[in-house]
Amino acid sequence: MESKDQGAKNLNMENDHQKKEEKEEKPQDTIKREPVVAPTFEAGKNCAPRGGRRRFRVRQPIAHYRWDLMHRVGEPQGRMREENVQRFGEDMRQLMEKLRERQLSHSLRAVSTDPPHHDHHDEFCLMP
């Protein structure tokens, strides 16, 4: 009789132990299955900015800003811009021509046999 009572107690203890394990496993499974959601910060709810976050929002660049400025011809400001662009283009052409002339003159002087015209800064002479 005592052996039957001990066997019943052992079964009850094993069942209780299994139930406890199942209860412990269930919360872990639910934790594993839930997706991790980042906390959202709303302004005005006593949220202080964290160290890694920027305090001010950076302004995004306007796409095609230069193209937009160059092609606004309908308004009077746009016409002025177009005139400025044309004038700027002419100035650039003149500067490029001057630069080309100077580069050619230096390269031609190195090739030509004519004596230099009072430019002694680039000459080097070892004769006494």
From Swiss-Prot:
Expressed in the central nervous system. Expressed in Schwann cells from newborn sciatic nerve. The keyword Nucleotide-binding does not apply. Changing residue 105 to A: Abolishes phosphorylation, leading to degradation by the proteasome. Residues 1-55, 107-128 are annotated as: Disordered. GO terms for molecular function: metal ion binding; molecular function inhibitor activity; signaling receptor binding. Residues 117-121 are annotated as: His cluster. Residues 14-35, 115-128 have a biased composition (Basic and acidic residues). The modification Phosphoserine is found at residue 105. Phosphorylated. Phosphorylation of Ser-105 protects it from the proteasome. It is found in: Nucleus; Cytoplasm. GO terms for biological process: axon development; axon regeneration; negative regulation of neuron differentiation; negative regulation of protein ubiquitination; positive regulation of neuroblast proliferation; regulation of apoptotic process; regulation of cell cycle; signal transduction. Pfam families: BEX (PF04538). The keyword Oxidoreductase does not apply. Keywords: Cytoplasm, Developmental protein, Differentiation, Metal-binding, Neurogenesis, Nucleus, Phosphoprotein, Ubl conjugation, Zinc. GO terms for cellular component: cytoplasm; nucleus. Zn(2+) binds at residue 125. Signaling adapter molecule involved in p75NTR/NGFR signaling. Plays a role in cell cycle progression and neuronal differentiation. Inhibits neuronal differentiation in response to nerve growth factor (NGF). May act as a link between the cell cycle and neurotrophic factor signaling, possibly by functioning as an upstream modulator of receptor signaling, coordinating biological responses to external signals with internal cellular states. Belongs to the BEX family. PANTHER family: PROTEIN BEX1 (PTHR19430:SF4), PROTEIN BEX1-RELATED (PTHR19430). Interacts with neurotrophin receptor p75NTR/NGFR. Interacts with OMP. The histidine cluster (His cluster) and Cys-125 mediate zinc-binding. This is Protein BEX1. It comes from Rattus norvegicus (Rat). The lineage of its organism: Eukaryota, Metazoa, Chordata, Craniata, Vertebrata.
